[in-house]
């Protein structure tokens, strides 16, 4: 089922680091995965409005960027012509403020993904096989979280990340502590050792 059109949206805020979650999802969909057609935009690039998109992903960063994140989700719905089932949103703010996103009535039907994509792609993305959703039958044991980020999608935008010449890898995820100021345990769960770097 290759050659589906997949759009990735990063809100128009300033940030140092590239959207690693979106980049892992791009790896799942891209040339080394499902072989779909990928497009990455930052902010509201209106050139994508007159195209058909099979799925639209929106990332989020910090909760104080609610306004920019909201604009991007609204824009994704505009692109999808109101078909909320095509829109998926995740990231830090969505994970930490999950209920606030779910409670927003204008976004009913949008899939708000909380935390890491550690389960099978169909389960992590809350896909419904009965509805015949794209890749809903992908119950593979290779979670999206374990994909190598697709750095090539960053070439599609005119934004320079201050740490653009770096590659990010994790030796572990999560944390055993529950510091009041930190969201890591809520986002990633308890401490989990990963591959050796």
Question: Could you tell me what each predicted segment is?
Answer:
Residues 171-175:
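Short metal-coordination and nucleic-acid-contact micro-motifs, chiefly zinc-binding Cys/His arrays
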Residues 176-185:
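Local cysteine-cluster metal-coordination motifs and their immediate loop/turn environment
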Residues 195-197:
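Conserved small/polar residues in nucleotide/adenosyl-binding loops
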Residues 184-193:
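Iron-sulfur (Fe-S) cluster-binding segments and ferredoxin-like electron-carrier domains
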Residues 4-5, 10-14, 18-165:
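Glycine-rich beta-alpha loop elements in corrinoid/cobalamin-binding modules
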């Amino acid at each position: 089922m290759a050659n589906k059109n997949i759009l990735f949206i990063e809100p128009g805020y300033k940030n140092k680091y590239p959207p690693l979650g979106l980049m892992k999802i791009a790896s799942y969909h891209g040339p080394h995965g499902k072989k779909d057609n990928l497009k990455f935009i930052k902010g509201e690039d209106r050139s994508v409005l007159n195209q058909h998109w099979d799925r639209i992903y929106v990332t989020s960063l910090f909760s104080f960027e609610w306004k920019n994140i909201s604009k991007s989700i609204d824009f994704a719905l505009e692109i999808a012509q109101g078909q909320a089932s095509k829109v998926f949103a995740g990231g830090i703010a969505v994970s930490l403020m999950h209920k606030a996103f779910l409670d927003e009535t204008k976004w009913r039907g949008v899939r708000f993904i909380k935390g890491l994509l550690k389960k099978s792609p169909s389960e992590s993305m809350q896909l419904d096989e009965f509805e015949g959703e794209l890749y809903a039958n992908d119950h593979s044991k290779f979670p999206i979280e374990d994909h190598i980020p697709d750095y090539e999608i960053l070439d599609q935008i005119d934004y320079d990340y201050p740490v653009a010449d770096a590659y990010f890898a994790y030796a572990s995820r999560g944390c055993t502590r529950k510091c009041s100021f930190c969201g890591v345990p809520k986002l990633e769960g308890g401490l989990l050792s990963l591959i050796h770097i």
